[in-house]
Amino acid sequence: MSNAEHLANIMVERFISAVKNGVDLVPVVADSTSTAKIAPFIKEFPDRLVNVGIAEQSLVGCAAGLALGGKVAVTCNAAPFLISRANEQVKVDVCYNNTNVKLFGLNSGASYGPLASTHHSIDDIGVMRGFGNIQIFAPSSPNECRQIIDYAINYVGPVYIRLDGKELPEIHNDDYEFVPGQIDVLRKGGKIALVAMGSTVYEIVDAAVKLAEKGIEVTVVNVPSIRPCDTEALFNAIKDCKYVISVEEHNINGGVGSLVAEVIAEHGAPITLKRRGIADGGYALAGDRKSMRKHHGIDADSIVDLALSLN
């Protein structure tokens, strides 16, 4: 894994490319220009940014209005404030009305570390899964992120994209092709499957390498497309396994662990699922990310220990 990049930088890069290629794209921020790292876009297109100030409801309402006026509206602000403060506007203005708005949840999960639960977003995927019409994605690498954003810009309809707040390493080859709904099987083998989304995918990739060094092969599944999701492909990826470990920097309810649980239950499969994430009823530990992930059992070493206990 190498060539780490910050996903917000990639987001801005794709915005600039889209406008240069004729897309009538308008970013909307809520006093979040630094969070969105959007200075390069402003330099290129100083009259194409809308800043509503610290007013997340206005952020989403304004974006919906721009979309109804024919623009490709993209909101760029921190996921915890987008999800909690603008919940009704996302539900009604964007999702119910099926407007062409792309919602970027920046610094998702526990990216803000020591700023604690006011700034953590551990329920965003669960919230968005409760709304209709909207597509939901969680990129796990720079390559995948570029492709998801390009797809979202060209797709007509609501999209939510969960972006981590730290640099992510590249885990995909140059020939990787993202397809909406797809399941990305990174490694196949053994009686244990590791399944993750977004920023924890590199943790399960790392865990798989460490397990292989101990002579244990595992299946590694990346789920970048939460909705649409090819659930049959997801089941086929794990159906021959005895155990599945889901890993996410999200509440264990509503995210990728819930998605896997639903798939296993609907198929009546004799597979034991171990969900690892932020515990039901809990909050993410405030502090540096390494300590937080170890505390919640979602770092590579904790995943290795759990897999060894099951093997």
Swiss-Prot record:
Instruction: For this UniProt record, give its keywords in alphabetical order, as a comma-separated list.
Output: Carbohydrate metabolism, Thiamine pyrophosphate, Transferase
Q: Which EC number(s) does the record attach to this protein?
A: 2.2.1.13
What terms describe the molecular function in GO for this protein? transferase activity
Q: What does this protein do?
A: Involved in catabolism of D-apiose. Catalyzes the transfer of the glycolaldehyde group from apulose-4-phosphate to D-glyceraldehyde 3-phosphate, generating dihydroxyacetone phosphate and D-xylulose-5-phosphate.
How it assembles, according to the record, is: Probable heterodimer composed of AptA and AptB.
Q: Which family does it belong to?
A: Belongs to the transketolase family.
Q: Know the name of this protein?
A: Apulose-4-phosphate transketolase subunit B
Species whose genome carries this gene: Actinobacillus succinogenes (strain ATCC 55618 / DSM 22257 / CCUG 43843 / 130Z)
